[in-house]
Amino acid sequence: MEDYVYKTKPYAHQADVLKVSWDKVNWAYFLEMGTGKSKVCIDNAGILYECGEIDTFIVIAPKGVYRIWAEIEIPTHMPDRLNAEVVRWRPNPPAALKTALMSLAEPAEGFRVLIMNVEALSTKKGQRFLASVLRASKALLAIDESTTIKSPRASR
């Protein structure tokens, strides 16, 4: 982890959280809103990829938030050298996106990032797709805005 070169320099609190959490199997970032949890999570994924621990980074977020990961957070904080293929879930994708999505259900050749909206997990199609990606990869799974799935009895 000490050799990891960040794309955007972390603030002290972000570096501290990452230092204690980067190699944990299960972890939650209980930081205040606006303190850079997304950046910490992206850095964590980058570190784990460079250490050979993961080949796929999966982000589950609410519909209004998941596009921000693909369009802003990942491009801003994920180091270019990782050459991550970022794919955003769509239930009825055009042909080119369908090919990219289906490739996620195969063993990885490089670093992949899947961004899914949490609402997709309320559908059999979304559940089956995520399960196929998880079976084919060594993944870090991150849940943004986890209050949407906080109850064990929730349909998601």
Q: Can you say where each PLM-predicted feature lies in the sequence?
A:
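SF2 helicase/translocase NTPase motor core
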Residues: M1-L31, T35-R156
